[in-house]
């Protein structure tokens, strides 16, 4: 308001100055509009006393409006002011002269006999062609002679230096001829006047318009804004802070966190004090929370959020609900930040909120399910070859769903393909240190979310399904139809040094997952049939090999054996041994390594091809060390087929040696881990020794 008053005062001062300038210009113009007279004085007799003769004089005067404006000519003759009061006819003068009258100060002549207009008329009656008034001592005579009086003789007013020069000629009793002429007015004088008046009028118009606008412009009443602010504050939500209840709801995963409760220690952004139980909190439309006594005074003055400057009076932008969030922000699940998915088509305003997972006790299972381009499930055997071609390009997305406490639940982060193991956490250490790290990071059930690139690309298994490749409704960990007990992850651990290599067992049909392998039961060391012994052998190249043998009790033989070709079980004594032998010899039976390894689509490794040449090419179908290990099966083979007995005995000893070689690996990993093929374990053991 003070600023408006200052502007109004400035405009009023400008208007006053403009009006004064216009008035002065108009007065000057009026004076200039008075007709000027040129008085030419020509002496009749020159002085012969030796002085310098005076020449002609040209003086300027002003025609008075009391008489007509016309030129005149005559001899110069002086009259006293009092002589013009006498109307007697005693003083006779020749007509045709020009009278000059020097006026005295008004103090001396307080009561003049006649007015100046009457004196000029009287001089004209006496024969004067014109009257000259010297008004040097009486400047008021100019105003007296401005009123027209109908005098026929011109009246000229003269003052200043020009009047002194003319009186000097009279005082020396010199005769002179005076000629009065009318001076021509300049033609551009009227144009200048109109230009000045136009500019002055324009300035005055704008000044008046600005003043009227300031007077008509009224600020909005402060009461209406205050009422709107109070109404908006009354509509805002409040809640009572309860810290214990908040912790319970966070633990159960049933609390939707806001911007202030997402921190471990929620504080008020205004007073910077922590929220305590029982305090009233004000919830703004932007999901920010403050103390009721801290934010209400701020809202009454500014009606905006202190953090995000959201205007609570802004009706154009609707307040964002709690369930919405900006599309560029990631929605995190409550306990596992790695399990995330992007939300879209949400309002852009507000603060992100965190939603808990429906079941925080489950990890995403690392089952070998895959999605093709048509979003259909495929078996790992079908996707193995496809994933190998894109293995090197997809190395940057191998790791998802890792908890922040231990990024790799199976042990350590894998190295890139072709890099040395010293770049990883082991830094060139032995297999024991890597195994210790692997065992140190296990959480309950061994769940591995990392499938590193292996040293042998042909022996690599397809990586586990990333959580972002699965549809939302098809996530096994979030599907309520799946059994929670069956959702577990197997431990698959690889290392660049090829120190140890674990593979899944032969896939078994399970009700929870068709590609999960059953775990082998851990044999108690207190069992009398369980013992270990150390053996020292010398290899073909002269190197010493130290093996530790673990004897386990053989399970009781069932009456059926598993056929790897048909994936079915059949009774052992349906036919005699010679018939079985003929069937085996006539069919294209895979080798022992293929039977032991199970159904695999990966090509055999280089170490396996070397061992394959020394293994027997044909074995009885009924002998499968992985599925059925009866002691009497070998004896029956010896009695019926001696040739088979020798081969089976060699293979049985070879399998036992493979089992013995795995004893060193059990020192570093407990028996509950999934075991790999015996040939691959032997190759790894050779490399380690």
Curated annotation (Swiss-Prot):
A molecular function (GO) term: zinc ion binding
Assigned GO CC terms: endoplasmic reticulum membrane; nuclear envelope; plasma membrane
Glycan-bearing residues: 56, 86
Any one of the GO BP annotations: negative regulation of Wnt signaling pathway
Protein's cellular compartments: Cell membrane; Endoplasmic reticulum membrane; Nucleus envelope
Zinc finger (RING-type) stretch: 268-308
Membrane-topology annotation of the record: Single-pass type I membrane protein
Primary site of residence: membrane
Enzyme class: transferase
Effect of disrupting the coding gene: Simultaneous knockdown of RNF43 and ZNRF3 results in ectopic limb development.
Family: Belongs to the ZNRF3 family.
Protein name according to UniProt: E3 ubiquitin-protein ligase RNF43
UniProt lineage: Eukaryota, Metazoa, Chordata, Craniata, Vertebrata
């Amino acid at each position: 308001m003070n600023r408006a008053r200052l502007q109004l005062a400035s405009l009023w001062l400008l208007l006053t100055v403009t009006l004064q300038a216009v008035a002065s210009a108009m007065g000057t113009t009026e004076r200039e509009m008075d007709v000027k007279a040129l008085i030419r004085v020509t002496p009749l007799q020159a002085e012969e006393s030796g002085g310098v003769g005076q020449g002609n004089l040209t003086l300027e005067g002003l025609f008075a409006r009391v008489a007509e404006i016309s030129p005149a000519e005559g001899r110069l003759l002086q009259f006293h002011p009092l002589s013009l009061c006498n109307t007697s006819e005693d003083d006779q003068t020749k007509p045709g002269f020009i009278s000059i009258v020097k006026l005295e100060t008004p103090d001396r002549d307080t009561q003049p006999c006649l007015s100046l207009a009457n004196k000029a008329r009287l001089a004209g009656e006496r024969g004067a062609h014109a009257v000259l008034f010297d008004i040097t001592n009486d400047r008021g005579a100019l105003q007296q002679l401005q009123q027209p009086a109908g005098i026929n003789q011109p009246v000229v007013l003269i003052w200043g230096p020009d009047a002194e020069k003319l009186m000097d000629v009279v005082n020396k009793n010199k005769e002179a001829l005076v000629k009065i002429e009318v001076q021509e007015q300049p033609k551009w004088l009227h144009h200048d006047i109109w230009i000045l008046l136009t500019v002055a009028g324009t300035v005055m118009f704008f000044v008046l318009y600005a003043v009227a606008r300031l007077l008509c412009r009224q600020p909005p009443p402060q009461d209406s804004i205050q009422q709107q602010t109070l109404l908006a504050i009354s509509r805002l939500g409040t809640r009572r802070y309860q810290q214990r209840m908040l912790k319970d709801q966070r633990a159960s995963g049933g609390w939707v966190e806001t911007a202030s409760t997402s921190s471990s220690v929620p504080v008020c952004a205004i007073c910077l004090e922590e929220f305590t139980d029982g305090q009233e909190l004000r919830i703004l439309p932007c999901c920010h929370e403050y103390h009721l006594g801290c934010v209400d005074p701020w809202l009454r003055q500014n009606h905006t959020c202190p953090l995000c400057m959201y205007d609570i009076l802004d009706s154009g932008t609707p307040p964002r609900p709690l369930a919405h969030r900006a599309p560029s922000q990631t929605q995190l699940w409550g306990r596992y930040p790695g399990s995330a998915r992007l939300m879209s088509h949400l309002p852009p305003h507000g603060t992100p909120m965190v939603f808990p997972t429906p079941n925080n006790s489950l990890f995403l299972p690392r089952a070998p399910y895959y999605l093709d381009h048509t979003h259909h499930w495929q078996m790992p055997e079908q996707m193995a070859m496809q994933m190998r071609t894109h293995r090197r390009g997809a190395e940057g997305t191998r790791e998802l769903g890792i908890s922040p406490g231990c990024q790799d639940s199976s042990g350590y982060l894998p190295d890139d393909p072709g890099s040395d193991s010293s770049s990883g956490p082991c830094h060139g250490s032995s297999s024991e240190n890597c195994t210790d790290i692997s065992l140190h990071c296990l959480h309950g059930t061994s769940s591995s979310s990392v499938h590193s690139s292996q040293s042998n690309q042909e022996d690599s298994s397809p990586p586990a399904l990333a959580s972002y490749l699965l549809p939302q409704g098809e996530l096994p960990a979030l599907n309520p139809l799946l059994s929670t007990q069956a959702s577990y992850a197997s431990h698959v651990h690889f290392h660049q040094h090829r120190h140890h290599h674990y593979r899944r067992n032969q896939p078994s049909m399970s009700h929870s997952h068709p590609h999960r392998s059953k775990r082998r039961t851990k044999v108690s060391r207190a069992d009398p049939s369980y013992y270990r012994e150390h053996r020292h052998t010398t290899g073909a190249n002269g190197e010493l090999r130290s093996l530790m043998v673990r004897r386990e009790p053989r399970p009781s033989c069932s009456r059926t054996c598993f056929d790897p070709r048909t994936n079915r079980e059949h009774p052992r004594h349906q036919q005699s041994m010679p018939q079985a032998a003929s069937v085996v010899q006539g069919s294209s039976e895979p080798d022992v390594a293929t039977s032991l390894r199970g159904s695999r689509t990966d090509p055999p490794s280089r170490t396996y091809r070397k061992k394959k040449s020394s293994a027997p090419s044909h074995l009885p179908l009924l002998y499968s060390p992985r599925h059925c290990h009866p002691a009497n099966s070998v004896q029956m083979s010896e009695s019926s087929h001696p040739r088979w007995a020798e081969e089976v005995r060699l293979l049985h000893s070879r399998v036992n040696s493979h089992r013995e070689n795995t004893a060193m690996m059990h020192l570093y990993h407990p028996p509950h881990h999934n075991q790999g093929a015996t040939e691959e374990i032997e190759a790894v053991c050779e490399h380690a020794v």
